[in-house]
Each structure stands twice: as structure tokens, then as C-alpha cells.
């Protein structure tokens, strides 16, 4: 079973994904290109930074899409939990110029069996990021304060993803984790 944990930064994606890995015996997948190309994390970060500094949203979409495609392709018939899949890429880069890239990615490599979209208001997300690291540079980015979920949900609906929204606004981290683990258990293939 392939599960994707999605949402804007500060909703708890990594914590939830790692809990699913540990408690439900899934393989945790983040930065699959690091594994594909056998790169050290700092080397992958340098490559990513160069790509992200390009003015071409098509190039960025393909680059991030390659990660998603490799993760799905190399983990067939395994229980994996992905710390992000396609949604944040689509939120930041999805537009008329890149739509075909996202269509092709889904058409050729498929979708997760279950996508869990974690939501929270921008204020709550910024507080969580600040609590985690008061010096996080993301706190100064105006785009981090965007809501973002309307565009993501449209994408999920357009491409018929099997998804569940978990509003984390008033949930504790442990409540969010339990809710997500129960969703995975109830849909486990």
C-alpha cells in the first residue's frame, strides 16, 4: 500500500509519516532522488537549490515529479508512506504551462493508494514552525502564509485521488497521528 502524507509546511507531515513507518511497519520515503542517485543530503540540496533558482516552472515541476515517479515505480507491492507526493509541487508550480507534466506523471506512474491531506490555518502552521525552530527562514516567506488547500483539493478531485482531509487545527499531535494511523489501518490493502 502506498500512502502519501500531504499538506502545507507546519501541519505535521513528517511526524505523522514517521509514526506510520514505526507503528504500522511501513517504509518511510522522503527525498527518493537521494537514494536513486546515491547522493549525500547536502549534495541533493545543492542540486535542488540550482533547479529551484531556475525561472522555468516546467523544469522545477519535472524535477520534483521525477522524485514522485521514482518513489512510486521503485516501491510497487511494498507498504510505503511518502512524506509528500505531488500536491506541494502542484501548489507551487501547477499552472497552464505545467498541467501536462502533472497529467503525464499520473497517467504513467499512477497515484498513491491513499492520500491524507493534513490541513491547518496559516497562523497555526506558522506557530508550529516557530515552536519547532524560531529561526526557520520559512517564517519570513510571505508565500508560507498562503492557505493553499483549495488548489490542492481541486487537483485531488480532478485526478480522482483516493484522499481524506484531516483538519489538524484543533487536534494535538498525538490525536493527529492516531487519526491518520487509523485511516491507514482501515484502508490497508
Feature locations, PLM:
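A glycine- and Lys/Arg-enriched "phosphate-lid" helix/loop adjacent to the NTP-binding pocket
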Residues: 97-154
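NTP-dependent small-molecule kinase module
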Residues: 130-189
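ATP-binding Walker
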Residues: 11
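ATP-dependent small-molecule kinase phosphotransfer cores
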Residues: 32-100
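Walker A/P-loop
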Residues: 14
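P-loop (Walker A) phosphate-binding loop of NTP-binding proteins
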Residues: 8
